[in-house]
Structure formats: C-alpha cells, structure tokens
A protein has these predicted regions:
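Active-site-proximal alpha-helix that buttresses catalytic centers in soluble enzyme cores
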Residues: 1-123, 127-128, 148-153, 178-185, ...
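Acidic, His/Gly-rich catalytic cores of divalent-metal-dependent hydrolytic chemistry
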Residues: 247-271
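Active-site-adjacent alpha-helix immediately C-terminal to a catalytic or transition-state-stabilizing loop
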Residues: 84, 91-101, 185-244
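Short alpha-helix plus adjacent loop in nuclease-associated cores
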Residues: 111, 133-143
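Short coil/turn segments at secondary-structure boundaries
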Residues: 31-33, 140-142, 214-216, 247-249
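Active-site glycine-centered loops adjacent to acidic/histidine catalytic or metal-binding residues
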Residues: 22, 132, 205
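Short, surface-exposed amphipathic charged segments that create phosphate/polyanion-binding patches used
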Residues: 140-149, 176
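Short glycine/proline- and acidic residue-enriched helix-loop micro-motifs
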Residues: 42-46, 133, 158-177
Length: 271
C-alpha cells in the first residue's frame, strides 16, 4: 500500500465539513447580463431569487434523502442575506408555528424572500461568522447590513461571534487580494478546531471556497473548481498538528476486567 496516497488518522482528530455555496442571488442574474451591474448599490446585500429558493428546496431534499440533516452538529453561515437564507432553507425545519417556544430561524418574507417562516425546532445550532465572507472586492452585493437589522429577520441565528455592529470589512475602493482570501480561509479552518462539533455545514461563497481550497495542492484537481449555486461538496479536515483538545470518544481501553493478554507475535519473538 502506497503511504503517499493513503493516510491513517485518529477519528477524534477529524471533522467532516459540508461546504455549500449559496443559491442564486439577484446579483448573479444581473451580473451575468452585465458585469458592470456588480457595481450597483441596487444589489446591496443581494437576496435569493425565486429560482434560488427552488435550488434551496432541491438541495434540502438531497440533504434529507442522504441522511445529512440528522448528522450535522452545527451550521455556519456567512452573515449576508443570500447565505443565511440558503442555510436556514436547506438545514432548517419547515412549518414554523407561533407560540411553540423556539424562535424561528427566519421570519416570513425575510429579505424580500416571499417565503414562509422557517422553524428552528430540533435543529442544530446556527451561527454567523465573518471569516467565511465572500472575497471582499468593491461589489455592494458583498456588503452586509448591520447586525441589528439581521437579528429580527433571523431570530435563531447566533450573531454573538461577530464583533462589529456595522460592516467594517467591506470598502468601496479596496480589493482584498486572492492570497488574503486564502489566508482568511485557513484561519477559518483553524478556528473550527476550537469547536467541539464534528460534522459541520458551512454556507458561504464561490470566491471564498475557491481560494481556500486552492491552498490545498493535494486536492486541486478534484476540488478546486468554482462551485455552482447551491452546490454541496463534503470534505474531511485533519488536525495533524494536534491543536484540538478533543479526547477520543469512541476508543475503548480494553482489559476490563484485567487479564493476561500477551500477543502471539510478541510471544514468538521472545522464543
């Protein structure tokens, strides 16, 4: 067996990530027609199109059919309308009812969605993280709203890890370099080791995903292609540096009760 292509790692040093690009947003449509449209403030914090919501519905069916919805411990979303709409639409629960004791993941019609409220009942936690924002260039579609505007729209999403009320990252005249996006992506992956969750869905953006995955030369041929809208790819990350603190939860020490257990091959070597 070629050790160069096959690796063996302890399970508790691994996490499974389900990477998702947001569904079609209004900026995708207008930008396809005319690239200069990306500079329009009419596309500020772009929301999903009706077609985008259809894409969300189809990915949701796929996630449920393959049992992923029952495995995921945490959902992370970039704090923009299109990513949060995609995240709650795919991984949330349908049929929210007032008075059930759990706030909705999304209220009805949030972000011009014309979509019913989405329940958080029996869902994993949802958190918003700035590190997985889109490649920050000069497009208003990538500028976020204030956190106080988002909270009433997405009551069950946790925004507590976002330090600034207003968007201090996006600037109208400064472009984030490709390498800066990749460094931010690696910082995000390293941050995941501070979390105890083992199976995580991440709803983010094409540019962020491309430049982050492009840093991993061993998977370039298979993974370093631009994501389609609402595409999902699953990967495993490994804590080779043993920076995480998680103990092995499924390992079992054996010898309970204690007894003699000299292996036969060791016994052979002693004779």
């Amino acid at each position: 067996m070629d050790s160069a292509v096959t690796g063996l790692y302890p399970l508790h040093r691994c996490k499974t990530l389900h990477l998702v690009r947001h569904a079609q947003g209004i900026h995708n449509v207008e930008g396809e027609k005319n690239h200069d449209a990306y500079l329009s403030y009419d596309l500020f914090d772009a929301h999903l199109t009706p077609l985008g919501w259809q894409q969300v519905s189809n990915l949701r069916k796929h996630v449920q059919a393959h049992g992923l919805s029952k495995k995921i411990d945490l959902v992370i979303a970039s704090p923009l309308l299109r990513t949060m709409q995609t995240a709650v639409g795919v991984f949330g629960r349908e049929g929210y009812t007032d008075g059930i004791g759990a706030p909705p993941l999304m209220v009805a019609n949030a972000g011009n969605s014309d979509h019913p409220a989405i329940s958080s009942l029996n869902c994993p936690p949802f958190i918003a993280i700035e590190l997985c924002r889109e490649h920050l260039v000069i497009h208003p579609c990538d500028k976020r709203r204030s956190i106080s505007e988002y909270r009433p729209l997405f009551p069950a999403i946790d925004f507590s890890l976002i330090e600034n009320e207003d968007d201090v990252l996006w600037m109208p005249d400064v472009r984030e370099e490709d390498e800066e996006v990749a460094v931010r992506g690696m910082k995000f992956l390293n941050w995941l080791w501070t979390r105890e969750e083992k199976e995580i869905a991440i709803v983010t953006h094409s540019g962020f995903l491309f430049h982050t995955l492009n840093r991993h030369s061993s998977i370039k041929s298979e993974m370093c292609k631009h994501f389609a809208n609402c595409e999902l790819r699953s990967v495993v990350i490994v804590d080779k540096g043993m920076t995480g603190s998680d103990a092995a939860k499924t390992d079992y020490p054996g010898k309970i009760p204690n007894g003699l257990d000299l292996p036969s091959d060791v016994a052979k070597d002693k004779h």
